[in-house]
């Protein structure tokens, strides 16, 4: 078969057979299935083969992510963190691209971590993703183009591409880089063209309609303008009307101002007359004040004289009273002397009687011994009472402490019971919707059970070390946590009957006395591997609950290790431990029933969602026991307190009786002493009284003394009478003087009153004048304000200008005439009738619309012409080139398809100016009797679509402008014949001089295939025994180079 020529010139290959942009090395670390991988692909066709799951697609994902692709285009995980190898925090991908020369290598490095963060480097320097994208765009690398980069998970998407999408992808992948640019520009221009055509048609129609309406309205508009002329004249007259009213207000203001000045003049004359009448009155008031002052002085002398006279009269009355008292005292003295002798006789008799009574009173001896005995007994009782009080206080303090401790215990129990509610809520949130109802039913009906019933199991289990909770929860199935456990068959039947509606399991524990529990022992070897506990030892629960968990889930065979155990899992398995947990993973080994082969599984450890909500069951039981102990202790102490209180009350009553007896003895002693003291005091008082009566002075001396006192009092009375006479004469003189001056003052007051009456009449007249002035002022102010308002109103209507003043001169000069003229013009305007009041506005608005739309229409026509020229220009550049490109693809595709099937063709679907509808149709025929059908899932099988797809991609090989192409498992579903033909096509295409680098990933290859030097095979092997061989191949040597070395070695030997 003759070689077909290349369709267009390519960049020549270098001496190393690589093109610029080819991938020369791929390095992966902690990426998907690989710990570390270094791959050096060939320059042409690279067959990446390996079993399913070995990591072929990992290589595709690495190329896409390192060359700026997003996770979404791979059709797998949507975040870069998902591509980090499981169990690792970060990984990286490094790809080396061939530069423009053999020595120039471009290294792109991308580091990713589980937090979805990326770090980019180019040739060892940190850069941004934008810089990386710019670099790969220089080589036309498009990882988002399905014709260049077809991952396994997006193969089906390529077959689903519509003709329009297929054309877009083909333009990006092959041909002139300006093709997709011109296509997008044509699509945008065609949209603009359609919009402009619609706008021109719409505006032309609107313009014609508006012109027809304007022609109909012209006659009505002329009548409206005539009416507007009359109304304009009315408006001009209305402008003069407020100025005429302003002139009238101004004349009224000037008249009011004149009247105000006349009133002010009259007020000034009245004020002068009033001041001339006030001067004589002031002189009379001054003279009256001097007369009143003299009257006041005489009045003061009269008052002083009266006070002196009153003082003398008082003294005279006092002296008269002394005389009368002295005479009475003389008479009383005579009577007292007669009674004194009688009192002396009576006092002598009383003294003798008191002395006799005191001598006859017996002597009282106090019972001291009895009192001391009673005091001693009372003291002892008080000591006993104080002891009981101290005991009671100590008991009260201890009782208070116990009650406080009990309250704390009860509060803690409530908190822990609330924690049980949290556990029940966690179960409800996990799917056990009615677990609360089941729990409450069991609690309310516990009296009906024969033996203890436990449940839900989650409430009964306590994990002291919370770090172990995730292991136990991960090992035990969820259904067990919501289960109830009975220990009697009848209890089980009762629970099943009543809890069935709540959807909770019921398990019956019958005991397991026959089986002995395996002892827990950690050997030194296990401890060295990090094993430190067994799963059945990490939690506390009632025996029945624990036995059920052990029997159901084999907790005795599951161990707990550390991070060291993670690293030495294989050694742990060799000890016979087939199930163990580490902080991050759960390891399990199982043996095949047939061949006895062992297989291992590793699962991640997830955070506990149920057990970490729980409480310590042991602590809960301790708190309940402690609560009962405290309640018993408090009850005992309360009884003790009551007995101490009773004993104290008895001792206090006994002490009160003794105290009362002692008080009675003391009272008797006190009364006897008091009685003797009273008799002695009575005797002494009577003796003193007798001596006092005997020592009273003589009667004659007292009478002489009283007569002398009466004589002195009579002399004082005479002196007072003489002085009183002098004061009476002086008082008469003062009275006469006061009367004269007072009459003169009354006369002056009368004259002043008459003058003031006259002045008041003048003041009233002046006040009336003042009110008249104020009224005139207010009138002027009112006129002034109305004048200012009239001026503002007039100015708001129109400002006087020379032109307006000239118009005003032609109008009537009075308000009445002007108003009549306004009414005449309004009548004439109103006589012009028309149907549409807004006819003028509509006419002017339509004229404006006609102008706007005409301008817009001219602009749109001009833009339409320019747009059509631009489209024609772009179309001449784009369509011939595209037709030629599709023709070349069709030529290659038809030739390749004839070798594999019956017939196939690629055609361009042209849609005139609907450039967004242009597309590429792939039509194929696999049977001679059939017809060419468009490639789709309705007409072809999966294998036929795969053959068609790969042949289309091969047809693009020698037209492509990209450095490499990736196709993942495109031969899946092909029959052996088509697969062999397809492979030969790929090998032949790869042998072309300028064919781009190609990666073909497949899990299978047919035997006896023909290979060429342009074909490189990358065999991916993965598994537990690949570590040692990978070290041998770490240099990246190929099988061919190894064979050459062996041949050379054999020749040398």
From Swiss-Prot:
Protein origin, superkingdom: Eukaryota
Disruption phenotype: Lethal when homozygous.
Record keyword Ribonucleoprotein present: no
Tissue expression pattern: Expressed in seedlings, rosette leaves and floral buds.
Entry's Gene Ontology molecular function annotations: ATP binding
CC annotations in GO: chromosome; cytosol; nucleus; plasmodesma
Coiled coil: 182-431, 617-798
Annotated region described as Flexible hinge, given as residue ranges: 432-616
Any one GO BP annotation for this protein: sister chromatid cohesion
Subcellular location: Nucleus; Chromosome
Location of the Zinc-hook domain: 23-991
TM segment ranges: none
Sites where the protein binds ATP: 50-57
Keyword Transport annotated: no
Keywords: ATP-binding, Chromosome, Coiled coil, DNA damage, DNA recombination, DNA repair, Nucleotide-binding, Nucleus
Subunit structure and binding partners: Forms a heterodimer with SMC6A or SMC6B. The SMC5-SMC6 complex is composed of the SMC5 and SMC6 heterodimer attached via their hinge domain and from the non-SMC subunit NSE4A or NSE4B.
Domain notes: The flexible hinge domain, which separates the large intramolecular coiled coil regions, allows the heterotypic interaction with the corresponding domain of SMC6, forming a V-shaped heterodimer.
PANTHER family, per the entry: STRUCTURAL MAINTENANCE OF CHROMOSOMES PROTEIN 5
Similarity field: Belongs to the SMC family. SMC5 subfamily.
Function, as annotated: Core component of the SMC5-SMC6 complex that promotes sister chromatid alignment after DNA damage and facilitates double-stranded DNA breaks (DSBs) repair via homologous recombination between sister chromatids.
Name of the protein: Structural maintenance of chromosomes protein 5
């Amino acid at each position: 078969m003759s070689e077909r020529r290349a369709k267009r010139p390519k960049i020549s290959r270098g001496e190393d057979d690589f093109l610029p942009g080819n991938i020369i090395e791929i390095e992966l670390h902690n990426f998907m299935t690989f710990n570390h991988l270094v791959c050096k692909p060939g320059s042409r066709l690279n067959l990446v083969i390996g079993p399913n799951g070995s990591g072929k697609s990992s290589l595709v994902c690495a190329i896409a992510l390192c060359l700026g692709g997003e996770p979404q285009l791979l059709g797998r995980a949507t975040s870069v963190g998902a591509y980090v190898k499981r169990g690792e925090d970060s990984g990286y991908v490094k790809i080396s691209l061939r530069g423009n020369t053999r020595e120039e290598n471009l290294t792109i490095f991308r580091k990713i971590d589980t937090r979805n963060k990326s770090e980019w480097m180019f040739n060892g320097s940190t850069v941004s993703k934008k810089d990386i994208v710019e670099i790969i765009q220089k080589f036309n690398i498009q990882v988002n183009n399905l014709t260049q980069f077809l991952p396994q998970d997006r193969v089906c998407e390529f077959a689903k591409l519509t003709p329009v999408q297929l054309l877009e992808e083909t333009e990006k992948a092959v041909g002139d880089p300006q093709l997709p640019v011109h296509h997008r520009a044509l699509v945008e221009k065609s949209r603009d063209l359609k919009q402009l055509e619609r706008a021109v048609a719409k505006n032309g129609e609107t313009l014609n309609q508006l012109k027809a309406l304007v022609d109909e309205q012209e006659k009505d508009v002329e009548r409206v303008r005539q009416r507007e002329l009359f109304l304009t004249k009315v408006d001009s007259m209305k402008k003069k009307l407020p100025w005429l009213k302003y002139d009238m207000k101004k004349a009224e203001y000037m008249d009011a101002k004149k009247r105000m000045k006349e009133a002010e003049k009259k007020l000034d004359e009245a004020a002068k007359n009033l001041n001339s009448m006030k001067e004589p009155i002031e002189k009379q008031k001054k003279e009256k004040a001097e007369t009143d002052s003299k009257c006041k002085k005489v009045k003061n002398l009269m008052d002083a004289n009266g006070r002196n006279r009153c003082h003398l009269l008082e003294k005279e009355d006092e002296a008269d009273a002394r005389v009368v008292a002295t005479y009475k005292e003389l008479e009383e003295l005579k009577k007292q002397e007669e009674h004194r002798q009688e009192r002396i006789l009576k006092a002598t008799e009383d003294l003798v009687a008191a002395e006799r009574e005191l001598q006859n009173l017996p002597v009282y001896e106090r019972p001291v011994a009895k009192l001391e005995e009673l005091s001693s007994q009372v003291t002892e009782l008080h000591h006993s009472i104080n002891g009981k009080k101290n005991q009671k206080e100590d008991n009260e303090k201890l009782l208070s402490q116990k009650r406080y401790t009990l309250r704390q215990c009860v509060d803690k129990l409530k908190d822990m019971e609330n924690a049980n509610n949290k556990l029940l809520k966690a179960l409800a949130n996990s799917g056990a919707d009615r677990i609360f109802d089941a729990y409450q039913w069991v609690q309310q009906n516990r009296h009906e059970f024969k033996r203890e019933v436990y449940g839900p199991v989650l409430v009964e289990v306590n994990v002291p070390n919370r770090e172990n909770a995730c292991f136990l929860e991960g090992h035990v199935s969820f259904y067990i946590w919501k289960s109830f456990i009975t220990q009697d068959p009848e209890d089980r039947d009762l629970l099943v009957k009543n809890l069935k509606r709540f959807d909770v399991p019921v398990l019956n524990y019958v005991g397991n006395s026959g089986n002995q529990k395996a002892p827990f022992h950690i050997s030194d070897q296990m401890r060295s591997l990090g094993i430190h506990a067994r799963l059945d030892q990490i939690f506390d629960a009632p025996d029945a609950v624990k036995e059920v968990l052990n029997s159901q889930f084999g907790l005795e065979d599951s161990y707990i290790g550390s991070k060291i155990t993670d690293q030495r899992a294989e050694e742990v398995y060799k000890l016979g431990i087939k199930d163990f947990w580490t902080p991050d993973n759960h390891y399990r080994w199982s043996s095949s029933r047939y061949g006895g082969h062992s297989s291992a599984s590793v699962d991640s450890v997830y955070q506990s969602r149920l057990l970490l909500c729980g409480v310590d069951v042991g602590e809960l039981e301790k708190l309940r026991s402690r609560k009962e102990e405290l309640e018993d202790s408090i009850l005992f102490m309360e009884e003790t307190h009551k007995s101490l209180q009773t004993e104290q009350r008895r001792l206090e009553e006994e002490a009160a009786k003794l105290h009362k007896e002692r008080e009675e003895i003391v009272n008797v002693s006190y009364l006897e002493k008091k009685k003797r003291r009273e008799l002695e005091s009575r005797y002494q008082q009577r003796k003193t009284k007798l001596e006092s009566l005997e020592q009273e002075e003589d009667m004659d001396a007292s009478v002489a003394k009283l007569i002398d006192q009466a004589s002195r009092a009579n002399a004082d009375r005479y002196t007072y009478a003489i002085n009183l006479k002098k004061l009476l004469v002086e008082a008469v003189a003062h009275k006469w003087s006061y009367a004269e001056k007072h009459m003169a003052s009354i006369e002056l007051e009368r004259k002043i009153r008459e003058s003031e009456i006259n002045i008041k009449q003048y003041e009233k007249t002046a006040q009336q004048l003042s009110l008249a002035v104020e009224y005139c002022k207010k009138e002027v102010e009112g006129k002034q304000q109305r004048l200012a308002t009239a001026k503002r109103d007039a100015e708001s209507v129109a400002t006087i200008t020379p032109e307006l003043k000239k118009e005003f001169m032609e109008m009537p000069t009075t308000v009445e005439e002007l108003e009549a003229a306004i009414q005449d013009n309004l009548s004439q305007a109103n006589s012009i009738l028309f149907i549409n009041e807004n006819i003028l506005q509509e006419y002017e608005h339509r004229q404006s619309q006609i102008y706007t739309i005409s301008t817009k229409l001219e602009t749109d026509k001009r833009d339409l012409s320019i747009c059509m020229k631009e489209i024609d220009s772009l179309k001449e550049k784009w369509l011939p080139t595209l037709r030629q490109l599709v023709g070349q693809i069709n030529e290659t595709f038809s030739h390749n398809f004839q070798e594999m099937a019956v017939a196939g063709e690629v055609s361009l679907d042209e849609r005139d100016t609907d450039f967004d509808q242009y597309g590429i149709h792939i039509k194929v025929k696999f049977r001679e009797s059939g017809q060419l059908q468009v490639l789709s899932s309705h007409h072809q099988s999966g294998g036929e679509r795969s053959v068609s797809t790969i042949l289309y991609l091969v047809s693009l090989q020698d037209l492509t402008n990209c450095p490499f192409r990736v196709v993942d498992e495109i031969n899946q579903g092909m029959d052996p014949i088509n697969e062999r033909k397809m492979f030969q096509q790929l090998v032949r295409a790869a042998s072309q001089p300028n064919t781009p680098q190609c990666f073909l990933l497949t899990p299978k290859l047919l035997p006896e295939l023909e290979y060429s030097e342009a074909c490189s095979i990358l065999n991916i092997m993965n598994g537990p025994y690949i570590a040692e061989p990978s070290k041998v191949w770490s240099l990246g040597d190929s099988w061919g180079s190894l064979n050459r070395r062996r041949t050379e070695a054999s020749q040398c030997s």
